[in-house]
Amino acid sequence: MTNIRKAHPLIKIINNSFIDLPTPSNISSWWNFGSLLGICLILQILTGLFLAMHYTSDTMTAFSSVTHICRDVNYGWLIRYMHANGASMFFICLFLHVGRGLYYGSYMFKETWNIGVLLLFAVMATAFMGYVLPWGQMSFWGATVITNLLSAIPYIGTDLVEWIWGGFSVDKATLTRLFAFHFILPFIVAALAGVHLLFLHETGSNNPSGLPSDSDKIPFHPYYTIKDILGALIMLLALLSLTLFSPDLLGDPDNYIPANPLNTPPHIKPEWYFLFAYAILRSIPNKLGGVLALVLSILVLALMPLLHTSKQRTMMFRPISQCLFWLLVADLFTLTWIGGQPVEHPFIIIGQLASILYFALILVLMPIASLLENNLLKW
């Protein structure tokens, strides 16, 4: 008789994805972040569900309801801070996952990569909407500034912004709809993640060498299940340490002040994981130009398969590309730092130079370096 895990229509899918899946024998810890992102998503959906039970999406009571969750609900403070810091862990894993993809040429799986870029946009949209919900000063002004960017779209911009606001400013209607979207989007993200995996399992995983690994595959279970559990434990340890020892480390103190449309905070800035994109937005003096640069800073990832000029898939054996990759990482750290600084000298010029370098590295320098390395192979 055939084993039930190989015969049952539902269990068969799980078996082929997590148990009998043929996996390259040499994938490193950089391949752990997919499973960590899955755990993050499940954690966010669960904590978010319990928060939604006590949260009210009304401008008069939203701030108070979050305070009520932290003070009066059993372990409400833990659920709230796990959710807030869980978002930070989510983005740390996302950035490392995308970085791995860039370094090891995983973008050559075009469908998987494009769904991944779509997922990145969806998660960023979800996180932005979630930041608005506590209805503190930074929530309100962040929502006002970011939604206002759409007014840069020619002709329809202003109408579009007022349509999204549900009025002539960020108000009750805006908060209610953002809560609705914040609730539904993670489930769309989960569905997209399923499609992401579906396309990945069509081709099989890449590996650090970038060479075909069909001749050397091992079953996912027990080798990589154990490895993923170790990764998950390390991530959960980091998340719990952050949540229990310094829950407000990555937050903004201004968000503990209830939203006040009559009082603008001195520095409006988003959460840390958006600061690099925010710095690129601010580095262009023109509104429409800034918005385009903001979108392109993420959308440029979709061009990676077209910009791949190397004869080798990964950067493992390409020292010049490696140097440029780590320069890109340093540049992103610089942009993140600049995004949190006030708009004044010398931060303006540093931000502009870092933004130019960001696009130059991805669009010009890395493809040229790859061509150079192709020629070096002939020596």
Swiss-Prot record:
The lineage of its organism: Eukaryota, Metazoa, Chordata, Craniata, Vertebrata. This is Cytochrome b. GO terms for biological process: mitochondrial electron transport, ubiquinol to cytochrome c. The gene is MT-CYB. Belongs to the cytochrome b family. Keywords: Electron transport, Heme, Iron, Membrane, Metal-binding, Mitochondrion, Mitochondrion inner membrane, Respiratory chain, Transmembrane, Transmembrane helix, Transport, Ubiquinone. A ubiquinone binds at H201. Heme b b566 binds at H97, H196. The cytochrome bc1 complex contains 11 subunits: 3 respiratory subunits (MT-CYB, CYC1 and UQCRFS1), 2 core proteins (UQCRC1 and UQCRC2) and 6 low-molecular weight proteins (UQCRH/QCR6, UQCRB/QCR7, UQCRQ/QCR8, UQCR10/QCR9, UQCR11/QCR10 and a cleavage product of UQCRFS1). This cytochrome bc1 complex then forms a dimer. Binds 2 heme b groups non-covalently. Gene3D superfamilies: Cytochrome Bc1 Complex, Chain C. Component of the ubiquinol-cytochrome c reductase complex (complex III or cytochrome b-c1 complex) that is part of the mitochondrial respiratory chain. The b-c1 complex mediates electron transfer from ubiquinol to cytochrome c. Contributes to the generation of a proton gradient across the mitochondrial membrane that is then used for ATP synthesis. Heme b b562 binds at H83, H182. It is found in: Mitochondrion inner membrane. It comes from Scalopus aquaticus (Eastern mole). The chain crosses the membrane at residues 33-53, 77-98, 113-133, 178-198, 226-246, 288-308, 320-340, 347-367. One of its GO terms (cellular component) is mitochondrial inner membrane. It is a multi-pass membrane protein. Its cofactor is heme b. GO terms for molecular function: metal ion binding; ubiquinol-cytochrome-c reductase activity.
